[in-house]
Amino acid sequence: NLMNLAGNFDQVWLKDNYMHSDGTYYDWNRGDVWNINPYWVQYAMKNTTQKDQYFAVASFKYSVNKNLYFKLTGGGENVNFSFMDYIPYSTPSTLLGQLQKSTFENKSYNVEFIANYQNSFKRFNYGITLGGNVYHVDNKSHTITAKNMSMHETVALQSFLQKEITEGSWRKEINSLFGMVNLSWKDLLYADVTLRRDQSSTLPVNNNVYFYPSVGGSFLFSELIKPNPILSFGKLRASWAQVGSDADPFMLDLNYIMTDKTFGNYSTGYISTGTIPNKDLKPSKTNSFEIGVDLKFLNNRIGLDFTYYKQNSNNQIMNVATSVT
């Protein structure tokens, strides 16, 4: 607001004249809603937020022997966020005043179980990991918007004649199974293979299970030429991976919002989105390929990294607005 004032305008005058003696807004520029007195915004309007966050993580590991262990990890988080926005009576943008109070609550937990086995055979080292994971999130929101302020001295919901309540909630859960095998030979060759299976609650029943694998390897060729006064370290690496992802909640059906209007004896409502839901929605898949080389010279004083990376995505999930025709 101050940026739009002339350079010779005394800004102290705005500070001394932002409010009448009865507490209403001092109209200094003919009700311009875009240039409200900034001191009115600072001292009369109110905006507060509060966030409370609690989380906990626990883990239990049991080793059967030096090669095999089981591990259970669980964690949860609870986030509560409250917001209050007050626009006083007589404010040019909202002459009758407005008070909005919102609360948001997000609860989530994540539980994972893995079994890991490591061993060696001659010059080979290998490891196998199997596991499962459950991720759940529960989100709720509640907003009260009060308008038409009748008691101008008291900032409370009871001071307003008109009130609108908006509530929302959604849940989501992903159940996963995964496995990984890693191999190495003589500290020269390394390979990793993974496979993951996810089942999501936000996809259609016939498409809510999806798999995505990955494979990677590396070759430490500098081990073959040790000692070398020039090349301290050299590694060739390559990997291919596929990652699957699901959709946001409520993308499979039309959602309706009720209004305070009636048609005869019937309540009215409207569709809350301009997108037609896809009943055959599929998980999106992203394929990535990477190859590169890492080099270090002169006792690791100089390093060079070269990487080629390519990524392609299929069945991307996005909203496309419906034509008005």
Predicted regions and their residues:
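Transmembrane beta-strand segments that form the barrel wall of outer-membrane beta-barrel proteins
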Residues: 191-200, 240
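Short glycine-rich loop/turn motifs
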Residues: 110, 174-180, 188-190
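Transmembrane beta-barrel domains of bacterial outer-membrane proteins
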Residues: 65-67, 73
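Residues on the lipid-exposed face of transmembrane beta-strands in outer-membrane beta-barrel proteins
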Residues: 56-62, 113-117, 130, 179-183, ...
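Transmembrane beta-barrel architecture of outer membranes
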Residues: 176, 210-214
